[in-house]
A protein has these predicted regions:
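Aromatic- and Gly/Pro-enriched helix-to-coil junctions and flexible linker segments
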Residues: 17-116
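Positively charged n-region of N-terminal signal peptides that target proteins for export
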Residues: 1-5
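Hydrophobic h-region of N-terminal signal peptides that target proteins for export
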Residues: 10-18
């Protein structure tokens, strides 16, 4: 019985570690977060702050405040500041992003903010 519990624990740790090792995908991981939390204000027909987040290319162009991402450096990326509760806090309307969503976006930026 103990060995079965140990095996399950080791399997859980291994699966958790492999999920962290997998690169963050813009289209699979981030696009759904942006769609749910950002696109009501940052889309082609309503670009608040002149920022369109509907596609990778438009998002990376940035808006009135410049590029939201400094690839490789989440701490210097405007989007991370805004979704981490700094002023102006984003999203303006609705609940703040969950910590795991902020972490995912930060990891993607640290990994180079690739279009994948």
């Amino acid at each position: 019985m103990r060995s079965a519990a140990l095996m399950l624990t080791l399997l859980a740790v291994a699966l958790s570690a492999s999920a962290q090792d997998k690169p963050v995908s813009y289209s699979k991981d981030l696009q759904p977060i942006f769609k749910e939390n950002c696109l009501s204000c940052h889309k082609p027909d309503k670009k608040k702050g002149k920022l369109d987040m509907s596609t990778y290319a438009d998002f990376m162009k940035g808006g009135k405040q410049g590029s939201p991402v400094k690839a490789g450096d989440p701490a210097k990326s405007l989007i991370v500041e805004m979704i981490s509760g700094k002023e102006p806090e984003m999203p303006e309307k609705g609940e703040p992003l969950k910590p795991e969503q902020v972490d995912l976006i930060s990891r993607w930026i640290k990994e180079g903010a690739k279009q994948n």
